[in-house]
């Protein structure tokens, strides 16, 4: 089995947390379509967010198995409104492509649940074909101006930080 003793202990504490804090709120979250920010913060305090992000950036310093356990236990409790997978995906985009300043600024707050993230990939007419995205980002001084449309943005309702898939140079094709 891939689970170590540390993974098993994490699984048990994750299961207890989800049963105590999330399951009693499940129906309300389904009805309203999102989980309130204070529950993200409770999850962060418990170590359920970004458990495989390096400790230097506020994460748990573990391996992907810890993320997998949080996904499994959330699904076990039928908690579909806990978009922690998105939190992890955005964290890894930041780890791979972000500047040092961005990592320091955002990752610790993502791990505590102070910042909720979303990913805007899917577009009307192209779905999730990332090579076919039409959304553009054009440099405007120190900023970028975005033009385009996105749909099905998980966590979009209450996100503080959104990772947007777009093209800065359509001549580059899929790059």
What spans do the regions from the language model cover?
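Intrinsic disorder at enzyme termini
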Residues: 1-9
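Internal helix-loop-helix
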Residues: 3, 45-114, 154-161
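Short secondary-structure junction/hinge motifs that connect adjacent elements
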Residues: 24-46
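A short, Trp-centered hydrophobic/proline-enriched beta-strand micro-motif
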Residues: 113-121
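Hydrophobic, small-residue-rich alpha-helical packing segments that form membrane-like cores
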Residues: 126-129, 144
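A structural signal for short hydrophobic beta-strand segments in well-ordered beta-sheet cores
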Residues: 135-137
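A short core secondary-structure module
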Residues: 143, 147-175
């Amino acid at each position: 089995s891939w689970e170590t003793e540390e993974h098993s202990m994490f699984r048990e504490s994750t299961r207890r947390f989800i049963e105590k804090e999330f399951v009693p709120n499940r129906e309300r979250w389904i009805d309203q379509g999102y989980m309130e920010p204070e529950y993200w913060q409770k999850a962060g305090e418990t170590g359920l967010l970004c458990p495989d992000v390096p400790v230097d950036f506020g994460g748990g310093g573990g391996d992907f198995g810890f993320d997998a356990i949080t996904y499994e236990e959330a699904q076990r409790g039928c908690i579909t409104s806990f978009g922690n997978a998105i939190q992890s995906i955005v964290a890894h985009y930041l780890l791979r492509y972000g500047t040092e300043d961005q990592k320091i600024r955002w990752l610790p707050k993502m791990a505590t649940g102070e910042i909720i993230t979303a990913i805007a990939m899917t577009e009307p007419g192209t779905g999730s074909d990332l090579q076919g995205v039409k959304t553009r980002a054009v440099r405007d001084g120190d900023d970028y101006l975005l033009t385009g449309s996105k749909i099905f943005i998980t966590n979009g309702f209450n996100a503080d930080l959104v990772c947007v898939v777009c093209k800065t140079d359509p001549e580059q094709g899929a790059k």
